[in-house]
Amino acid sequence: MDKPRKENEEEPQSAPKTDEERPPVEHSPEKQSPEEQSSEEQSSEEEFFPEELLPELLPEMLLSEERPPQEGLSRKDLFEGRPPMEQPPCGVGKHKLEEGSFKERLARSRPQFRGDIHGRNLSNEEMIQAADELEEMKRVRNKLMIMHWKAKRSRPYPI
């Protein structure tokens, strides 16, 4: 019974020792003065982005800070601010600038492309005949494929 009493007596003595042994509390970053914070922030920023490299690394960001914000502009306002295009880029949309119906424009462009078909100058009748021949070949090919498929599956055992 003496031992438990000694342990109990030692515990209160050890408790004050832990209080005395505590290391001094360091100041949290929130409690530091603003001057210390700003100097630390500047040094960390300088490590990552030295001032001489900033314009090279982030030119868009720097330019965007100088520009006044353009907020509240609707799509109509943005399009009205642009000058109208006189000629579309790369010839895209030329047909919109030309006058006449689709058939008229097609008839005008036909002579330009007449010789482009495999280097041959074909009349309309010849082109129609060639198209009919191709369609007939496709039909015959499809019929043969269907016949082959049916013949394969009509047997009681696989080939």
UniProtKB/Swiss-Prot annotation:
<keyword id="KW-0991">Intellectual disability</keyword>
<feature type="compositionally biased region" description="Acidic residues">
    <location>
        <begin position="37"/>
        <end position="54"/>
    </location>
</feature>
<feature type="modified residue" description="Phosphoserine">
    <location>
        <position position="43"/>
    </location>
</feature>
<keyword id="KW-0225">Disease variant</keyword>
<keyword id="KW-0804">Transcription</keyword>
<keyword id="KW-0805">Transcription regulation</keyword>
<keyword id="KW-0539">Nucleus</keyword>
<feature type="modified residue" description="Phosphoserine">
    <location>
        <position position="44"/>
    </location>
</feature>
<feature type="compositionally biased region" description="Basic and acidic residues">
    <location>
        <begin position="17"/>
        <end position="34"/>
    </location>
</feature>
<keyword id="KW-0597">Phosphoprotein</keyword>
<comment type="similarity">
    <text>Belongs to the TFS-II family. TFA subfamily.</text>
</comment>
<feature type="compositionally biased region" description="Basic and acidic residues">
    <location>
        <begin position="64"/>
        <end position="80"/>
    </location>
</feature>
<feature type="modified residue" description="Phosphoserine">
    <location>
        <position position="39"/>
    </location>
</feature>
<feature type="modified residue" description="Phosphoserine">
    <location>
        <position position="28"/>
    </location>
</feature>
<feature type="modified residue" description="Phosphoserine">
    <location>
        <position position="38"/>
    </location>
</feature>
<feature type="region of interest" description="Disordered">
    <location>
        <begin position="1"/>
        <end position="97"/>
    </location>
</feature>
<dbReference type="InterPro" id="IPR021156">
    <property type="entry name" value="TF_A-like/BEX"/>
</dbReference>
<comment type="function">
    <text>May be involved in transcriptional regulation. Modulates various viral and cellular promoters in a promoter context-dependent manner. For example, transcription from the FOS promoter is increased, while Rous sarcoma virus (RSV) long terminal repeat (LTR) promoter activity is repressed. Does not bind DNA directly.</text>
</comment>
<dbReference type="Pfam" id="PF04538">
    <property type="entry name" value="BEX"/>
</dbReference>
<dbReference type="GO" id="GO:0005634">
    <property type="term" value="C:nucleus"/>
</dbReference>
<dbReference type="GO" id="GO:0005654">
    <property type="term" value="C:nucleoplasm"/>
</dbReference>
<feature type="modified residue" description="Phosphoserine">
    <location>
        <position position="33"/>
    </location>
</feature>
<protein>
    <recommendedName>
        <fullName>Transcription elongation factor A protein-like 1</fullName>
    </recommendedName>
</protein>
